[in-house]
């Protein structure tokens, strides 16, 4: 079975949330933030699923902006 790596840019405002900061103690407020995942689904479909709430990471659902294909295209499919 093929798997795909994907990288999603998160809005920088995610850093305002205490729960996020507690899970990411080295996060510097105002810096770029990314979510990295893998799936049997192609990245665009998986991003849409995150945004719709299907098996979604709560930060991606709320703060996901866009896929960053230049970070993962060269590795796919795994």
Regions found by a protein language model. Name each.
Residues 1-48:
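GIY-YIG nuclease catalytic motif and its immediate N-terminal context
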Residues 41-44, 48-78:
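Aromatic/basic micro-patches that form nucleic-acid/chromatin recognition or nuclease catalytic surfaces
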